[in-house]
Amino acid sequence: MRFSLQREVLLKPLAQVVNVVERRQTLPVLANLLVKVREGQLSLTGTDLEVEMVARTAVDDAQDGETTIPARKLFEIVRALPDGSKVTVTQQGDKITVQAGRSRFSLASLPANDFPSIDEFEATERVNVPEAGLKELIERTAFAMAQQDVRYYLNGLLFDLRDTTLRCVATDGHRLALCETALDGGSGSKRQIIVPRKGVQELQRLLEGGDRTLDLELGKGHIRVKRDDVTFTSKLIDGKFPDYEAVIPIGADREVKVDREALRAALQRASILSNEKYRGVRVEVSPGLLKISAHNPEQEEAQEELEADTRVDGLAIGFNVNYLLDALGALRDEHILLLLRDANSSALVRGAEHQHA
């Protein structure tokens, strides 16, 4: 096997797949990338047995073959080479030679036959999703995923397929984030799947936005996302996601409209003097005014006041300031709506201009 590519052309697919490879592995071959050259196309595959990423690019000067090469070493070598370098990778027995100009590196390889693949994938549903739409779904919801929760089904992101729409939902039991986008032509089916945290993070890193349409395929135990140059596959979490619609506040008729960035800045300032353990802030709403206060065990106190468009006579409610800041960071609207019922009920935060998140 042999191929030659410009450094920048090789670096892009390498960067796409190398993050899938774990730094510590149970199998030595999992530290490697599967490298294949077939009919003028180079494919690079990385996996941790839960997530698999395959990146492809065209090569002109190439000889067909396949092997596995240490992922991070190859990536670091190519990244460290000068811009504009022509990189030639050659296989000689169980050794891989990487050459660029006067630089030459020799790496150990493992047989391609030892490289594991994710279980056989058979798609039961296929939908087309705008890349920008899927990127937005993940960016606006992934922050609310649980981390290492014993309720394992919360350690991921729910994809709720509903004929003409796709929803993403995440919750850690304290807060919930939801966003939806329209599907091109609809799906004709309904299904819920849970993608694990690492799969969500790798998919988010992969998506670039833009006008491209992605092929999203759902199998019995996997999700696959296809783009011209990349195929992403992830195992699913086998569990039932909570009935999230039951916890979305209904009847929250006390509405506050406020500038998102102004509220975010005020919360950040007030949080400096909040209790470091509980991170609580008190939000008081009165006609035309939003008052934020925080205090800590040292008897220190912060107060912020903001002009707001309110439909509330008077109400005080406590929040974890980190949860509010995460929600405001995920929204993109200039103004947000804070929908309240009473001091003991959940609050709803959403964009004032685009109410799909």
Residue ranges and their predicted role:
Residues M1-A357:
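Structural preference for solvent-exposed beta-strand-turn elements
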